[in-house]
Amino acid sequence: MPARFDCFVTGTDTEIGKTLVSAVLLTRLADAGYRAAGLKPIAAGTLAGAPTRTNEDVEQLRAAASVNLPFDTVCPWLLDAPMSPHLAAAREGVTITLPPILDAFAHARSLADAVVVEGVGGFRVPLSDDFDTAEMAVALGLPVVLVVGLRLGCLNHAALTAEAIAARGLHLAGWVGNVVDPSMAGLDDNVATLRRWINAPHLGTIPRLPHADARLAAAHVDIAPLLARTAETRR
């Protein structure tokens, strides 16, 4: 049986590839023999015209997972409006709270060897007036995988996010670069700078793909450093 592996995926911003990287991790874990489950506890924006109320990111995670979980477990908080979760929740007259998220994680963990939990937006996105994504990550207490959207400004965003993760006592287990702007000047030099600045393994850089395909992207990501640390922790 594989050693237990769980992680929390966050990013330097919104729309920088967290869902793609989460799906890549699930794909790689399943290939390594794990029963892998994905959670996106909070999703803002429902698919227009879908036969049932759902979210595109949630469906990508469900497709990549090797453990089939009920939708409400994968995403206990689904909001209609594609905006900051605290604003979307206020529009619907609800308040996002932590217990349903922790319950969903516990349920997923009971059925899987590995659970990948994807955050929403960046690391400090508000979830309510007094609760944000960072606090959700702390409550889960998982090692963090950081997705860096490679575009102008990524060095500052990555450094600030890595500092915020460390300041909360969380372990940054690795980071993945995702090319958001293929015309970015000095892209390779920026990646080299990130490798020096971020005190965590660089798991890979995903080039700009024709479409967000987890199997194609998985060829550019190595999860061995994540699994090696898990094995060391169990010794």
Swiss-Prot record:
ATP binds at residues 15-20, 57, 118-121, 207-209. One of its GO terms (cellular component) is cytosol. GO terms for biological process: biotin biosynthetic process. Pathway: Cofactor biosynthesis; biotin biosynthesis; biotin from 7,8-diaminononanoate: step 1/2. It catalyses: (7R,8S)-7,8-diammoniononanoate + CO2 + ATP = (4R,5S)-dethiobiotin + ADP + phosphate + 3 H(+). It holds the Pfam family AAA_26. The active site is at residue 40. Keywords: ATP-binding, Biotin biosynthesis, Cytoplasm, Ligase, Magnesium, Metal-binding, Nucleotide-binding. GO terms for molecular function: ATP binding; dethiobiotin synthase activity; magnesium ion binding. Coiled coil: none annotated. Homodimer. Belongs to the dethiobiotin synthetase family. Catalyzes a mechanistically unusual reaction, the ATP-dependent insertion of CO2 between the N7 and N8 nitrogen atoms of 7,8-diaminopelargonic acid (DAPA, also called 7,8-diammoniononanoate) to form a ureido ring. This is ATP-dependent dethiobiotin synthetase BioD. The gene is bioD.
